[in-house]
A protein has these predicted regions:
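Compositionally biased regions
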Residues: 2, 13, 20, 36, ...
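Mixed-charge, Lys/Arg-enriched low-complexity segments
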Residues: 84-160
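Short, extreme N-terminal segment that most often corresponds to the first beta-strand
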Residues: 1-23, 27, 151, 157-159
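Amphipathic, interaction-prone secondary-structure segments
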Residues: 19-84
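N-terminal non-cleavable signal-anchor helices
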Residues: 9, 33, 48-49, 66, ...
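N-terminal cationic leader/targeting segments used for protein routing and processing
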Residues: 12, 31, 43, 53, ...
Length: 160
């Protein structure tokens, strides 16, 4: 049985490969990063970010436009975990009573309203297929976000 440090090193190599593959497939991804800790080395997170670090609102990376994926190497699963938020347009607030008192909505919620299906938990067969699934989902969500916000820096919805 491998030690925790060995598991982190082994998983980090796989994550670097996955991040490289995602970066190649996603033209709107400015950076792809991962995190893997000693506390539970088999569960790692990949963040596909659509903003440059200097463009983060208030300099905080959690305020960015990103998708986070959870990769479990022990259970061999890949799933969507969370995303960044976009300010709602005034048109959406007027037309939808559920959104009237909200300031923001998640990127995935905006994409779901545009007809994109949510990513389901899937099996991690190999690095290439998992990276392709994550990249495809990121591209679909970003297409809906670009339509909603009219492009970079994806800050607020625009009335159309």
């Amino acid at each position: 049985m491998a030690t925790r440090d060995e598991l982190v090193a082994m998983n980090s190599k796989q994550l670097e490969e996955i991040c490289g593959l995602i970066q190649k497939e996603c033209p709107l991804a400015k950076q792809v990063r991962y995190s893997c800790t000693n506390f539970y080395p088999n569960i790692c997170f990949i963040v596909v970010d659509a903003l440059n670090p200097q463009d983060y609102p208030n300099g905080i990376s959690d305020n960015s436009v990103f998708l986070m994926f959870r990769v479990d190497f022990e259970a061999k699963t890949v799933e969507y975990k969370r995303s960044g938020f976009i300010y709602l347009s005034e048109k959406d607030k007027r037309e939808n009573p559920k959104l009237r008192y909200l300031a923001m909505n998640s990127m995935v919620e905006i994409a779901t309203r545009a007809g994109v299906k949510k990513m389901r938990r899937s099996q991690h067969k190999d690095n290439a297929t998992s990276a392709h699934k994550m990249a495809t989902y990121f591209n679909e969500v970003m297409k809906a976000v670009v339509d909603y916000t009219d492009g970079y820096p994806y800050k607020q919805g625009v009335e159309k």
